[in-house]
Amino acid sequence: MSGNLQREALLKEFENAGKMIHAFDTAPEGNGEEDTITELPVVKNPGLGVSSETKAENMEDTGFPRWTEFFAKNETVSLPNRNFTFNTYFQVPEVNSSDLSSIPIFLAHHGAGSTGLTFAPLAKTLKEDLGTNFGFFSFDARGHGETKPLDPTDVTYYLNDFVTDFVELIVWFYENYLKACKQSKLSLILVGHSLGGSVCANLYEHLPEYIKRHTTGLAMLDIVEEMAKFVLTKVDHFLSVTPNVFGSAKEAVDWYQSHNYSKLKESAEISVPALFHKAKSGKVVRITNLASFKPYWDSWFDGLSAKFVSLPTSKLLILAGNDNLDKELIVGQMQGKYQLIVFQDSGHFIQEDVPKKAAISLVDFWKRSDNRNVTIKTNWGSSQNKTLEGKKTVE
């Protein structure tokens, strides 16, 4: 598709303010008959904070599901050198309980205006598939959810701020929880939705070597540089027609559902209340002020596609409802530099709308990216499977 034709398509797609974030369809999570998947290329992998258990629930009286149904722990992590206390959610694999040759640890970063609980449905679905033999880490980024600045007068929102925050949180998680795991089994997968995808793509090179060597791949959810930059030009109008105050958390959930911003009710009931805090009046008020990020938008997505394609690790891009790629991604796809999956029945929040499909895709990505999981089934010597590193499965 030429640049002009693609831009015209994007203009049509986003001319309606209600479709600013993504062109939603109304289909429920389906059987995937129209989804598209490309092959995964074979790639060879190239100050700690103080934490405390979060004691109170911001919206605990909503009657909706609590974080405990999705994660094992919810801790507040203080990182003075980052000027923030971060609200984190995570699941730690059971030590010495796995017969797997590798244990996946998914490290997730949400997009602008969201919170760490956007990954709750995905984490729960992964647990249903993998049991206790996996880890998952999610958190509220600066300016979002229950994460708070130590000095509110000295806060910026450049891409590098988000990147450095996440790097330090990954180090904290590794030092405090992952060191107890058998190091030879660790397989870290970076997962970023929207802005979080840009954060993950840019942080890879900043990871300490002792963590980078365990990093198996990067999965970006519904983010394309050219489209993301265009969407930012429409945010002002989107904000002008989006309510910041609701009479209750239930009203907020109902609004998101009725406007197709969340396709699964069970996902909306955990992710939407986390976007608001309860005022003394009893009403709920949106926590994140997206308008305050405007001076920093130019730094968020510049060069993302080229960065993603060139990363020296396995890469997965999952898009929702369309397959519009910019030039860098088209060339990279033709060269087999990353795997592409398109879900036709999902909105922008893939991890909420189709958590089962997203989980299946991430598990498959992990297994195919980590050579320790690959086996050859032989017809000689023994009926048992023999594991050979670096080979594909052969019947």
Swiss-Prot record:
Which residues act catalytically here?
S194, D222, H348
Q: Keyword check for Flavoprotein, yes or no.
A: no
The enzyme's E.C. designation: 3.1.1.89
Name the catalysed reactions: [phosphatase 2A protein]-C-terminal L-leucine methyl ester + H2O = [phosphatase 2A protein]-C-terminal L-leucine + methanol + H(+)
Signal sequence coordinates: none
Can the keyword Cytoplasm be found in this entry's annotation?
A: no
Q: Which UniProt keywords apply?
A: Hydrolase, Serine esterase
Write down the top EC class of this protein.
hydrolase
SUPFAM superfamilies membership: alpha/beta-Hydrolases
Q: Which domain of life is it from?
A: Eukaryota
List the molecular function annotations (GO) for this entry. Answer: protein C-terminal methylesterase activity
The function of this protein is: Demethylates proteins that have been reversibly carboxymethylated. Demethylates the phosphatase PP2A catalytic subunit.
Can you tell me which family this protein belongs to? Answer: Belongs to the AB hydrolase superfamily.
According to UniProt, the name of this protein is Protein phosphatase methylesterase 1
Q: Give the source species.
A: Kluyveromyces lactis (strain ATCC 8585 / CBS 2359 / DSM 70799 / NBRC 1267 / NRRL Y-1140 / WM37)
